[in-house]
Amino acid sequence: MAMNLLNTASIAKEMQTKVTERMGDWFEAEFKAKANSASRRTRLIRSHGHTYTYARYQNTGQLSSNLKQVKKGDKIVIDAGTRANYTSGYHGMYFLVEKKGMQEVKTTLKKGANYANSMKL
């Protein structure tokens, strides 16, 4: 009788860590790109016969530099830092306060699911 010497538990654990690391890298890069594009986005204000432009979220450029991966047990969390990491105490999470930002989070999560399903190890 031949015994199967494959340790499936260790193989599954290794696969889980590889998938978690790749997904963490992918989400970090994706959210940094979204934060950079938000920092360049301008708003048009029409007032008193003139048109003014200004960057609505000027500190979101800081958001992309403050995003980092934090390993918590078996999981990887993308952390945006605290208010102290930003100038003027502004946290920079435009994703939570603007409709366009919330839509970008939804599409990024959908893309993440598709990326996980199409990942080749």
From Swiss-Prot:
Plays an essential role in tail assembly by capping the rapidly polymerizing tail once it has reached its requisite length and serving as the interaction surface for the connector and the tail tube proteins. Belongs to the Skunalikevirus tail terminator protein family. Homohexamer. Interacts with the tail tube protein. Keywords: Viral release from host cell, Viral tail assembly, Viral tail protein, Virion. The lineage of its organism: Viruses, Duplodnaviria, Heunggongvirae, Uroviricota, Caudoviricetes. The keyword Cytoplasm does not apply. Its main location: virion. Transmembrane segments: none annotated. GO terms for biological process: viral tail assembly. This is Probable tail terminator protein. It comes from the Viruses. It is found in: Virion. One of its GO terms (cellular component) is virus tail.
